[in-house]
């Protein structure tokens, strides 16, 4: 239970579980409860205390570290800086909306002197484990640049999903996933007109629209599984995409001290969603892992290269970085970013050996083992491991252990996965030597953890007693 002193009003009546359907309908026109802000009624300080206890418990129960370990007793979930709001709002630079049908009473709104349609299609989101999306009036966690667009006012007939992005430079990219039963050209024309009416000259507002047909299975759109967070469509080949007004990628910039890194990230590509997360994670990686000039490093589950760029800058012209990523969209970004003239190379990494590999991490670790044995790459010094919420698995960790790196930095968005994999690494002879956690998802139950592992000292063998 949440102590009364730690309670606070939720961020909007759509997120208030204590409000009645009638109260929500009267305030927003939408009676349903919106998910995604399950900690919104708890003070931020209490949220971080809860998350600290969760990380400690998972590392203890699943990873085997004793609760009295200084790594756990000294752990505090750290707050990330927020530019626009200090209540844990307006931090999401990436938001995926589902589109849901909303029935209205004819004539309850006026548009150009005509009665509004009885049915409109609005942006929505899935409540926790719900099969149907709920219309969104305002999503308080979204960045202000996205909230100010008021996407809920668009009639998105023919659209299945909307992916909204705002870059560190303030450019907005809206990707519309179009139902294959509709003409993508007609849908694009209609939405572009609505956007121009609502926002004026899109180029001046730095807004780009991008339309993609949804893939189908047996002629029907693929459906989203209840409770699933995975995208129910695959990306179609570039030739089958329709580009709307503007670009289909954004430029992200990350600074840490005097270092500045640039990245090109496509629509649908992966990037950290908290505005302050990229700089925080790069700084944390550099201070914990301490990559040195001339070292050989691995960046596993590398995405567009957030850590790859910083690693390459640190190891310099005499060092090596191997990046492995499975997503075709994100891998394509990484290949472009780290081409000889790629935007993610710095003056210090202009001549760094950077290998960008697409595919399954566990499988390619076998290839790296072979490359090591034949002297094709130098001995591996440091590894960044940043898997998805499911974490790495025993096979991946055993193959990584076989490469015999000196240190491993594990970045985890699920403390249970980190706890499980900590237990596996300890079995393989690794010690956790540093642990930090960050409130990268305020007003939700999610938390980011970063752990540094080093090879445990070899234990002396017990001396056998001599027998006569």
Spans of model-derived segments:
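Extended interfacial segments that mediate partner engagement and assembly in macromolecular machines
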Residues: 1-163, 167-169
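Rossmann-like S-adenosyl-L-methionine
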Residues: 182-468
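Nucleotide donor/acceptor-binding cores
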Residues: 93, 172, 294-295
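Short strand-loop junctions, especially beta-strand C-caps/beta-turns
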Residues: 40-42, 139, 177-179, 266-270
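Short, well-ordered strand-loop elements centered on a beta-strand within folded domains, enriched
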Residues: 1, 104-128, 170-176, 208, ...
């Amino acid at each position: 239970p949440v102590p009364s002193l730690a309670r606070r009003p939720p961020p909007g009546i759509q997120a208030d579980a204590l409000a009645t359907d009638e109260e929500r309908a009267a305030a927003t026109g939408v009676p349903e409860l919106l998910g995604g802000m399950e900690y919104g009624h708890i003070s931020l300080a209490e949220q971080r205390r809860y998350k600290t206890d969760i990380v400690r418990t998972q590392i203890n129960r699943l990873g085997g570290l004793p609760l009295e370990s200084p790594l756990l007793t000294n752990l505090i979930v750290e707050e990330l800086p927020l530019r626009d709001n200090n209540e844990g709002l307006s931090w999401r630079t990436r938001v995926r909306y589902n589109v849901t049908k909303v029935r209205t009473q004819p004539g309850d709104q006026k548009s150009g002197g005509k009665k509004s349609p009885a049915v409109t299609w609005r942006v929505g989101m899935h409540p926790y484990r719900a099969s149907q999306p709920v219309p969104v009036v305002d999503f308080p966690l979204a960045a202000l640049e996205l909230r100010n667009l008021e996407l809920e006012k668009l009639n998105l007939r023919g659209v299945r999903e909307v992916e909204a992005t705002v870059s560190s430079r303030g450019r907005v990219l809206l990707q519309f996933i179009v139902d294959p039963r509709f003409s993508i050209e007609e849908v694009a024309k209609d939405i572009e007109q609505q956007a121009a009416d609502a926002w004026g000259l899109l180029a001046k507002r730095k807004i780009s629209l991008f339309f993609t047909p949804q893939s189908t299975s047996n002629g029907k759109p693929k459906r989203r599984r209840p409770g699933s967070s995975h995208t129910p469509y695959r990306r179609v080949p570039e030739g089958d995409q329709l580009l709307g007004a503007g670009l289909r990628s954004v430029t992200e910039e990350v600074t840490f001290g005097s270092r500045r890194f640039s990245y090109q990230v496509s629509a649908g590509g992966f990037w950290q969603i908290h505005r302050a997360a990229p700089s925080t994670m790069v700084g944390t990686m550099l201070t914990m892992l301490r990559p040195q000039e001339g070292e050989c490093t691995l960046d596993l589950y590398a995405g567009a290269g957030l850590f790859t760029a910083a690693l390459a800058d640190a190891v310099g012209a005499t060092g090596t970085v191997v990046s492995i990523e499975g997503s075709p969209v994100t891998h394509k970004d990484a290949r472009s970013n780290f081409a000889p003239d790629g935007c993610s190379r710095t003056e210090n990494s202009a001549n760094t050996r950077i290998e960008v590999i697409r595919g399954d991490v566990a499988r390619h670790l076998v290839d790296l083992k072979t490359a090591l044995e034949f002297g094709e790459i130098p001995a591996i010094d440091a590894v960044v491991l940043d898997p998805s919420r499911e974490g790495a698995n025993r096979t991946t960790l055993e193959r990584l252990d076989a490469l015999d790196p000196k240190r491993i930095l594990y970045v985890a968005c699920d403390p249970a996965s980190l706890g499980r994999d900590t237990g596996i690494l300890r079995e393989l002879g690794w010690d956790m030597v540093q642990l930090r956690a960050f409130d990268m998802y305020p007003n939700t139950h999610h938390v980011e953890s970063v752990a540094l592992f080093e090879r445990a000292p070899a234990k002396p063998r017990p001396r056998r007693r001599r027998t006569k």
